[in-house]
């Protein structure tokens, strides 16, 4: 995949393209991109994605926190795995936000990116205030020689709260992660959710009670952190993957105050890994975070948690994304 940020330096060849932020690069995105690739192959053209390095709403409101499923670097890596020809990175500026759909199609898609066919997701809108729809895009396309095609809608086989074939969206996945439903989120993403970051110093309490932990400082402050609780995770660093018992929360038994921490006990591992880059890949939430009446009661529960975590991970298979580290 060729990443093009500056078309004055690299002129893309004519293409079949689609537009989107593609946060999470989830199953719905993948289905849309597959259609772009198939049409491009049939037409003898390049396949292209027009996307944005920064969430458009954050550009317009610097206080907005998007709660990303994927950082810009993670998104590019996942898109590259899918195998499109071009990733056209468009800086979403206030000037771009003011373009009407027709201006966007003319000035950017046609003149800058050489788009010949535009594949529109079933519910996607673009242009100033997203005020126009598919029929408008078709009409503008005819005027400027871009054929606009409506993508087939993605039908999932996912059932949530007794509702079958739930439409997959980035918003749904965020909701699931906020509920700790990381296994259902993985079904929607088609890979297990992960956090990347650096191991930093902590309070050393875990070490004193027999469960030393590595405390994670997440790479991107806009990355979504799943719900508080205990999780079975894969821990990857130095090109090796280990089983881990992860806690997200405020550690109420130890009275950590309001400070939310992300700390993982790596099973059967006893070395310090301070300052190392690690990846935590979520498999299943085993329980919510609880306040115990004593440290001794907490220790008893941690032994049970470790046994359950190991059983879950031994029955699972580390996703390929858990092995990809910087």
What annotation goes with each model-predicted range?
Residues 2-8, 88:
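Short acidic-hydrophobic, aromatic-tinged amphipathic segments that line or gate anion-handling sites
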Residues 9-13, 94-97, 154-161:
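A short acidic, often aromatic-flanked loop/helix-cap motif at beta-alpha or helix-coil junctions
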Residues 9-71:
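N-terminal catalytic cores of NTP/NDP-binding nucleotidyl/phosphoryl-transfer enzymes
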Residues 26, 79, 118, 185, ...:
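Residue-level signal for inorganic ion chemistry
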Residues 56-144:
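N-terminal Rossmann-like or analogous alpha/beta NTP/dinucleotide-binding catalytic cores
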Residues 145-247, 326:
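Glycine-rich, Lys/Arg-enriched anion-binding loops that position phosphate/diphosphate groups
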Residues 202-326:
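Phosphate/ribose-recognition catalytic cores of enzymes acting on nucleotide-derived substrates
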């Amino acid at each position: 995949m060729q990443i093009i940020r500056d078309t004055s330096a690299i002129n893309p060849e004519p293409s079949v393209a689609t537009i989107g932020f593609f946060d999470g690069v989830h199953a719905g995105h993948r289905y849309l991109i597959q259609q772009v690739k198939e049409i491009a192959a049939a037409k003898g053209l390049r396949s292209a994605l027009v996307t944005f390095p920064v969430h458009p709403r954050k550009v317009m409101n610097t206080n907005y926190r998007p709660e990303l499923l994927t950082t810009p670097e993670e998104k590019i890596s996942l898109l590259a795995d899918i195998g499109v020809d071009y990733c056209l990175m468009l800086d979403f500026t206030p000037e771009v936000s003011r373009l009407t759909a027709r201006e966007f199609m003319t000035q950017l898609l046609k003149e800058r990116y050489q788009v010949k066919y535009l594949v529109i997701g079933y519910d996607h809108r673009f242009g100033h205030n997203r005020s126009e729809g598919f029929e408008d895009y078709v009409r503008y396309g005819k005027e400027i020689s871009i054929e606009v095609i409506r993508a087939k809608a993605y039908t999932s086989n996912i059932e949530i709260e007794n509702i079958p074939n739930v439409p997959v969206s980035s918003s749904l996945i965020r909701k699931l992660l906020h509920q700790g439903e990381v296994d259902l989120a993985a079904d929607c993403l088609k890979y297990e959710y992960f956090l990347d970051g650096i191991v930093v110093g902590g309070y050393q309490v875990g070490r004193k009670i027999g469960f030393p932990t590595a405390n994670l400082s997440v790479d991107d402050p806009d990355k979504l952190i799943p719900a508080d609780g205990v999780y079975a995770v894969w821990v990857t660093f130095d090109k090796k993957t280990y089983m881990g018992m992860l806690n997200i929360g405020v550690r109420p038994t130890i009275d950590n105050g309001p400070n939310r921490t992300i700390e993982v006990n790596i099973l059967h591992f006893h070395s310090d890994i301070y300052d190392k880059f690690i990846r935590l890949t979520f498999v299943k939430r085993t329980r919510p975070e609880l306040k115990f009446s004593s440290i001794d009661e907490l220790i008893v529960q941690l032994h049970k948690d470790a046994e359950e975590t190991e059983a879950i991970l031994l029955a699972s298979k580390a996703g390929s994304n858990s092995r990809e580290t910087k």
